[in-house]
């Protein structure tokens, strides 16, 4: 039932640097799998609440996934999560959806599942679960007065890894193990409350740093059948962030937590390459051949809309892409959830996904060749007359749509007029019908014309305190 590999234009120069130094880091390649699958005696779960609904039942479970570090390193080692489960009265599938979510450990117990997850469970006849508090936060590390959240927490743990080489430190290790624990708990719990019904596998999704976690759990756990990572448009991190600087001439304020921790100064260093061996999805791509739908935002505060050029073509197996126009990083006020539902339903029902290829042509157009004809093809475009910057924060929600007619059956060519000043970004969106009357929207990558980058990237002087370089001096 799986479609043929979905391909795009090939972009030159998108590989992370390799060589003898990179090969010496091979010992880190299995660290993630070893960490995630190591048995942790802290693992346990407890049903806290059962809520009956019309055609479904909700369960609020307190899950302890692991111990992270020791009390000599951090003020709280046990990672506690709320695992909120929706079970339809009639379960039609052995596949469940796991949404990896955030939140604070200061939050009260959930009153139940979110409406959107109830809707997905009832519509598809499948179990849907939201795993909250990934990462556990806030955490206060030894020697610090302030508690850290989100990117500040992650950046701090990266810095610790760069200086020590200790694979226990990167918070993404524990974040990934959290999802493994959630899947374990679901496979144990569902047969108890559903007359022996079993779960065989999972579709995993999550946004931003939880989108990164979506990639990493798929790389190390074969129970993951497909993934839908949201707004984590930064695989192949080194060339991606060099591109970031060359487009903007500065680091976007959204990544200030990493700048403040001096993470950007490590870019390209042996220590950073070691971290990538551990937790960067791009380095694990040989294990990521499963179906994948990557949903990104054209106006993301963190990532450029042209970032997929550094990874998408090199991903293996079935792959689809959607850039949501006029969207910030949070994907609010968009139909991204409909695309997620349509894709998830296609996985559950073993329906082939649409196949198409695109290329960026020498005349400045995007050429799209479809195996299955879409209901409609649309060109979305936006202009910034002063900067190569398409964040909503910079240009507002200014992307506009225009229907494009086929050149021949299933073939579309998207031409745009160059702006008198500045840069124009554009993409082609293809809309397909589905059996559940929810459209599946997929896109090409984003093209920017003229293809110029106004700023030079100057490589930083790497810190001397790295666990590799300090031994070489």
Put a short name on every predicted segment.
Residues 288, 294-296:
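Short beta-strand/loop motif that positions the catalytic acidic residue
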Residues 162-208, 223-224:
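Gly/Ser-rich "nucleophile elbow"/oxyanion-hole loop immediately N-terminal to the catalytic nucleophile
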Residues 216-265, 322-325, 331-338:
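Hydrolase active-site cap/lid region
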Residues 301-307, 332:
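Conserved alpha/beta-hydrolase "acid-adjacent" motif
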Residues 102-107, 118, 126-180, 234-247:
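Cap/lid segment of the alpha/beta-hydrolase catalytic domain
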Residues 342-381, 400-410, 414-415:
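Surface beta-strand/loop "capping" patches
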Residues 16-92:
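Catalytic-loop region of hydrolases
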Residues 82, 93-103:
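Short beta-strand element of the alpha/beta-hydrolase
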